[in-house]
Amino acid sequence: MAEPQFAAPDPRDVDARAVRRAFGRAATTYDAAAVLQREVGARMMQRLDVVKLVPHAILDAGCGTGEAVGELSARYPGARVIGLDAALPMVNAARMRARRGNSLLRRLLSPLRAKADMAAPQFVCADVNALPLEGVAFDMVWSNLTLQWLNDLPRVFAEFRRTLKVGGLLTFTTLGPDTLKELRGAFARADGHTHVNRFVDMHDLGDMLVQSGFADPVMGMEQMTLTYADPRALLAELKAIGATNATRGRPRGLMGKARWQRMLAALERMRRDGRIPATFEVIYGHAWKGEPKRTPEGHPIVKLQRRPP
């Protein structure tokens, strides 16, 4: 009997355990360094201004330290907001932020009004690939700069759709292929290992949404460039937010002084106007959960309308 054949893991795939560890270690340094995440989150929030939806239940998938959870709670008073993250230290930091926010609100408002104006958010430590939220139906799923850390995006989109109500909104951001192209190029000059994540193209994401059953997907992209005084400042900021090399093909030992110096020298040659640039291709997407077209068993649903007499 022939031995079963198993596909070798792709070295460009993300190691989920390494991601959890990195973000767990970064829980205490994340807020001070998350410049890009905060700016992109603010732009996401602005895009909600034109959305005609008053959600009663919201999921923040990949909530990190919980900044967006508080902003969504303030934007939609009375809504049930659940923050979910795979890294327990991040979830604990988000809980602490929520407690501080609720305490401040109660000092500013009368206790009865504060309780009526803003429901306390809830937090869950779990994997976005398998949401442990049976029986919970959301009007909105929000996810800011999380999807780039996940390998099986069709599965993730299917989970989001499963937990949304009909007519519910998925709104998300992620990073596209040009992200950290300077750092990727510098490492390529130093050695042959994978050092930067693989990022999915905007058009492929739109196709995945349609294939997952979402309706009316809208995709957009913009490039943002952050600049740094030197290469070490860039690397230190990435480490502070947990964005370290978590690919399966990452080197397990130290890089070596000679190769490290080659990488730093390659980044130095990219210096413009005295600063080291780092490009981020930010992808924005939203889509809606429409009426189901098939039963859970896979049978097509045909709606019949009664003719007027």
Regions found by a protein language model. Give the residues of each.
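N-terminal, positively charged/glycine-rich alpha-helical extensions of SAM-dependent methyltransferases
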Residues: 1-28, 42
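Conserved alpha-helix/loop element of class I SAM-dependent methyltransferases that forms part
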Residues: 36-56, 67-71
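Class I SAM-dependent methyltransferase SAM/SAH-binding core
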Residues: 57-131
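A short acidic, Gly/Pro-enriched loop at the edge of an enzyme's catalytic core
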Residues: 129-141
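A short SAM/SAH-binding and catalytic strip from SAM-dependent methyltransferases
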Residues: 139-152
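A short glycine-rich, Lys/Arg-flanked "PGG" loop and its adjoining helix->strand segment in the class I
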Residues: 154-166
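Conserved catalytic/acceptor-binding region of the Class I
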Residues: 169-233, 240-254
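C-terminal lobe and adjacent flexible extensions of AdoMet/dcAdoMet transferase-like proteins
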Residues: 236-309
